[in-house]
Regions:
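Juxtamembrane intracellular "pre-TM" segments in multi-pass secondary transporters
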Residues: 1-8, 183-219, 404
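Substrate-agnostic recognition of the 12-TM MFS/MFS-like secondary transporter fold
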Residues: 9-25, 48-62, 68-81, 99-154, ...
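A single, central transmembrane helix in multi-pass transporters
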Residues: 15, 23-27, 156-163, 206-268, ...
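Extracellular/periplasmic helix-loop-helix junction of adjacent transmembrane segments
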Residues: 23-51
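Transmembrane alpha-helix termini and helix-breaking/packing motifs in multi-pass membrane transporters
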Residues: 26-35, 86-90, 144-164, 234-243, ...
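C-terminal transmembrane bundle of multi-pass solute transporters/carriers
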Residues: 55, 72, 240-404
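C-terminal ends and interior cores of transmembrane alpha-helices
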Residues: 78-92, 289-301
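Helix-loop junctions on the cytosolic side of multi-pass membrane transporters
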Residues: 116, 120-121, 162, 166-193, ...
């Protein structure tokens, strides 16, 4: 696959940009916490980062269809590089929030154009291998990014990590600059972007409301965003405050995130074999029970236990994600898939924004151990209940019987 020059350049650009984003997942919370020492402000920064994705989810895909995708990617990379290079020089929370929001806008606009460009440079028969290579690379980046950030931060501070992130975006821009995409004939737009977005949102919402599988998966993924929030906000405070490891907090937090990502990557690699043995419903069930691994935090276990819990959480989370994505793809007609994915992404991102806001408020009041345990119990037990209440489990069983 990498022998195809255009795909190789696009793949390298994806790799570099994703590495930059992975570095920021560790560096951003550390920068905010070092500056403010506040869980509420840390949660608020991530709310601000996520809200642009909620607004742009249905529009960004249409921009990728109407505008030159190469120019979108190049502009997004250069803009993000310039913005994150400013972060080490900020001294106020509102400055970080503004830059974080603008970078999030760039991420939201670039992603659909990036996905849409892959089929343009790969023959139809090689699309699955191309996507597989991209997925494996993304899994590796999720491990390397936090580990790299940990190394930089351990030696210096969070600031230089953003310089490294800016370099990643510049490398991505260099790859895109040399990329040539084939010309695409686009039909003239018959409606304004706003009207088209309203129509697509309506179509997507109808499917989410009326299809029990899509409805259930959307609801449980929104609930799962609480886990994402505690991994960023609460785990950092657990290390810095509960374990009283302020001097080593940056390094340990980075390594914990890398451990979770390693679990996700390894879980993805073995998911297919596990599915063949136990079936997809059990694969997804085990994945959605994974947050129960956060409950041991209530007794403040030693660090090795926390590392093990996060590894298992990531390992089984990958099973839930893979099973969920497969069910989602099978439940939605191809003609509606783009609109449903856009609506689903917007809904889950909205859940993420609410989750970060709630966890930022809850963590200093309950304390990190109790917050981790509470979220683990609520999501680990509540996820399967949500799937049952929404009719998702019954619909999956009917489909399994019909397909037998």
């Amino acid at each position: 696959m990498l022998a195809i020059p255009a795909f190789r350049r696009l793949w390298l650009a994806q790799l570099a940009a994703q590495l930059g984003e992975a570095i920021a997942l560790v560096a951003m919370p550390l920068l905010v916490y070092d500056l403010t020492g506040s869980a509420e402000l840390l949660g608020a920064i991530f709310v601000i980062q996520l809200l642009p994705r909620v607004v742009l989810a249905p529009i960004a895909g249409m921009l990728a269809d109407r505008l030159d995708r190469r120019r979108i990617l190049l502009a997004a990379d250069l803009a993000r590089a310039g913005l994150v290079a400013l972060l080490p020089f900020t001294g106020l929370a509102w400055q970080i929030a503004l830059i974080a929001m603008l970078v999030a806008l760039g991420n939201a606009i670039a992603r659909p154009a990036e996905l849409a460009a892959v089929p343009m440079v790969v023959p139809a028969g090689l699309l699955v291998p191309a996507l597989s290579i991209s997925q494996v690379a993304a899994s590796v980046v999720r491990i390397v990014g936090p580990a790299l950030a940990a190394g930089v931060i351990a030696v210096t501070s969070p600031g230089p990590a953003f310089g490294l992130q800016a370099l990643c975006f510049l490398i991505s821009a260099g790859c895109i600059f040399t990329l040539t995409l084939p010309a695409v004939s686009r039909a003239p737009a018959t409606t304004t972007l706003l009207l088209a977005a309203r129509r697509e949102i309506g179509d997507g919402l109808r499917v989410v409301r009326n299809n029990p599988i899509v409805r259930g998966i959307t609801a449980v993924e929104m609930l799962w965003q609480l886990v994402t929030a505690v991994l960023v906000v609460t785990v950092l405070l657990y290390v810095a405050v509960t374990l009283r490891l302020r001097d080593e907090a940056a390094t340990i937090f980075s390594l914990l995130m890398a451990t979770f990502a390693a679990g996700t990557a390894i879980g993805s690699l073995v998911a297919r074999r596990v599915e063949e043995r136990i079936g997809r419903p059990r694969l997804m069930a085990l994945g959605y029970l994974a947050p129960l691994m956060l409950i041991p935090a209530i007794v403040t276990p030693p660090l090795p236990v926390l590392f093990a819990c996060l590894f298992v959480l990531g390992f089984t989370d990958a099973w839930a994600v893979i099973a969920m994505q497969t069910y989602l793809a099978e439940a939605v007609p191809d003609a509606l898939r783009g609109r449903v994915y856009a609506t689903w992404t917007g809904a889950v991102t909205l859940g993420g924004a609410a989750g970060f806001g709630l966890i930022g408020w809850l963590t200093p009041r309950l304390g990190p151990p109790a917050t981790l345990a509470l979220v683990g119990a609520v999501v680990g037990i509540g996820g399967p209940i949500v799937l049952w209440v929404t009719g998702c489990i019954a619909a999956m069983r009917r489909d399994a019987v019909a397909g037998a």
